[in-house]
Each structure stands twice: as C-alpha cells, then as structure tokens.
C-alpha cells in the first residue's frame, strides 16, 4: 500500500485548522497530514494536538517551530520528515482553503496512475480559482506566475 502525506504549514490558523484537516482526512485515499506550526499564538497547535490524540491518531502529525519562520522554510523540515518516514507521495497545501482538498485526488492520480513523476496544481489552469484572497494578492500572484514562466 502506498502512503500519502499532505504538508500544511500554519500560522494563526485556529479558525481553519480543524476543518482543513477533516477535509483531507475524509478523502477516500487515506491521506496522512503533517502540520508545520510556526508558534501560532492563537492556539492552532493546541487544536492539532487534540485532534492527534482524539480523532486522527496515527494519521495526523505536527512539527512545532519556535516563532514565525515563514512559509518557505516550513516546507524544508516537512519534506525531510516525509522522506525519513518513507512516504511514497508528498503533497503541500495551505490551511486557509485557498487550495481545494479535493484536488489532492487529481494530483495523486497523475502520479500513481498516469505515470507523472511530479504533479503541480495551479490556481490559473482553466481560469483563476482563488478563495479568501484580496484582489491585489490575486493579481500579484497571477502576474508573478506569468513573469516566472516568461523568464
């Protein structure tokens, strides 16, 4: 059986964390979740710890970091942890539902069943699909993506 891990970095995601974890855990393929919490002062880590002990024992994991170290640096210990624990498939997503958890199924299918070594989701395939972002952030992200492809 192949193992699948979703890495979710968090900072002050108390309002979303239980819902995003539940959404991923309820998917049919048995995903595991690794939360990388940057010392959220709002109690995000406490919610995750409770879910680890009561609801998702063995499938929910957490790395707590001291202080807000940033999104990019959160993925490094997450990927190292996934490799150390020999996960076959590693995914990353945001805690605020700006990524649709159902898309994990499509990404998994691309790698497991269609022969892709890497599958990358984009908010800009088939139009812009961004949730909970102000228009300025959407435009900046969209044009930054276009610029990177051009360069």
Task: Give, region by region, the residue ranges found by the protein language model.
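Residue-level signature of catalytic and energy-coupling elements of molecular machines
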Residues: 17, 24, 78, 96
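Short loop->beta transition adjacent to catalytic acidic/histidine clusters or analogous donor-positioning motifs
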Residues: 2-4, 25-35, 43, 59-60
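A conserved acidic beta->alpha catalytic loop
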Residues: 37-46, 97
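Short beta-strand/loop segment that forms part of the nucleotide-sugar
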Residues: 21, 30-40, 63-64, 93
């Amino acid at each position: 059986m192949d193992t699948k891990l979703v890495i979710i970095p968090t900072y002050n995601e108390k309002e979303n964390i239980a819902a995003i974890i539940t959404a991923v855990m309820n998917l049919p393929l048995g995903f595991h979740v690794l939360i990388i919490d940057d010392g959220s002062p709002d109690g995000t880590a406490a919610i995750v710890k409770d879910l680890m002990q009561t609801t998702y024992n063995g499938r929910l994991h957490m790395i707590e970091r001291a202080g807000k170290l940033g999104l990019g640096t959160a993925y490094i210990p997450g990927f190292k942890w996934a490799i150390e624990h020999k996960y076959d498939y590693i995914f990353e997503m945001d805690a605020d539902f700006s990524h649709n958890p159902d898309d994990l199924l499509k990404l998994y299918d691309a790698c497991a069943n269609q022969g892709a070594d890497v599958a990358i989701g984009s908010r800009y395939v088939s139009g812009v699909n961004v949730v909970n972002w102000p228009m300025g952030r959407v435009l900046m992200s969209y044009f930054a993506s276009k610029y990177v492809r051009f360069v």
